[in-house]
Amino acid sequence: MPTTIGRGISNIMRHGTANFGITGTDWQEKINWDRLRTYRLESARARMKAHGLGAMLCMYDENCRYITSTLTPGWNRLKPGLRYALLCGDAAPVLFEQGDIGAQIARHSPWIPEENIRYSYAWIKGAAGGASEQQVTKFTNAIVEEMKRFGVAGEKLGVDFIDINMIGAFEKAGIEWVDGMSAMMEARSIKNVDEQECMRIVAAIGDAAHWETMKFLKPGRTENQVTAHIMQFLFNIPGLEDVEDVIVSSGPNTWPNWRNFTARIIQPGDIVFMDLAALTWNGYKSCYYRTYCVGKEPTQEMNDTYEQALGWLYDSIEAVKVGTTTKEIASKWPSAKEAWGYEEEDQAAANLWGHGLGLAQYDPPVISRIWSLDHPIEIKEGMVFALETQHGKTYQYGVRIEEMLIVHNDEVEIISNFPVEKITVVDPM
C-alpha cells in the first residue's frame, strides 16, 4: 500500500518481509538454490557473449562466486589469484582452487564437474617477489590450455582484474584481454526471485541487529563495545558468513561521518548511528543505517536535521521506478554546495548515496550527484539497492538513514523494516 513516510510521496511503495526461514526443510522449497546457481551462471554467460568475449576470467570474490557458487573463505578475500574461475563459451566453469582444497570443492559443490577443478598458480599481487614471473607464466599457460580445450583459443578474454605481471605474460602468450568487469556488473545488477529472497532475509537479519543495538546501547558503553556485541549477535545466525563492518559512531564522530568506530564513551544525549556494512548471508550483503539518541530526548535542532535527511531519502525513493534513471534519483538531492557549502560534489562523496547490493556491497547502480547527472543508468526490474542520506553539525552530531529496496515492475519494495520515521530514543532520563 502507499506509504506516508517522508514528504511528497506519491508512488506505490510497500514494505516487504522475508517469506521463509533460514534453515532447510523437506516440506518447503524456500530459496531454490539450484535455480539461483543456474540463473547466475547463465546471466554471466549471456553478458559475456553480448560483449563479444570467448571466455571470462574471474578473480574477484564476488564474480568467482557468481559463476561457480563456491565460497571464498575470509583469509582468501582481497587476494586475487589465490583462487579464480574461468568461464569458456558454453562450458561449465573451471575453478582454480588453492592447493588441494579442490578435493573439498568436489565434495561440497558437486555442480562443478570434477574434471573442471584445478589448483591455482598464485603470486599474491607480487608478494612472491622474484618468483612472480614464474608463477604468472604457469597461470597464463593454464588459462590458454583451458581456452583451447573449450574451443575459444584466440577469442577475447574478459578479465575483472589485471596487474603488471599479468599484462606482460598475456602479451607473450598472445592473449587478447579486455574489460570483463563491465559484463559481470551487468549480470549481477539484476536479481532473480531467489536472490531477491536472499536480500529480504539479509534485511530481516539487519532489522534484528538494529533491535539488538537499541537494547544494548546505553551511556557508558563504548563504540567498539557496541560493534563487538553486534558482531557476536550476527555470527550466531545460521548462514552468516562475514561482516565487513559494524560502523558505530557517536557524538562528534557522527559529523562528518567517518564511517568507523573507536573506544569513545557514549554519553547522555549523544546521537549514535550504526551501519551494518555488508553483513553477509549466503554471500548476499547489506548496507543499513539507523540513528539513535542515547539517554536523553534529541533536541529540536537534532529532530529538524533528521527530518531534513529523511525528506531527502524518501524524495529519492519516490523517484525510483522501472524505466527512469539514476539521474532522476540523484536530482532529488541538494548539491554539495547547497547542503554543506562545498565547492565540488566529490567533497561530499557518499553523503547522499545509492548503491546496488548483492554478492558485492557495490553492485550497479551506484547513485551520486558526482556522476549520475551526466552518466545516468536506467533503473530496471530486479535491481536491488540501498539509498542513504545524512546531515549534521560539524563535531557535534550527525544523522544518517538508509533503506534497502527491490525494484519491481509496478512498485518499490522496501525491505529494511526497523522504524525510520524519527530518531530512535534509547532509555531517556
Residue ranges and their predicted role:
Residues 1-429:
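Active-site neighborhoods and metal-handling regions in enzymes and metal-associated proteins
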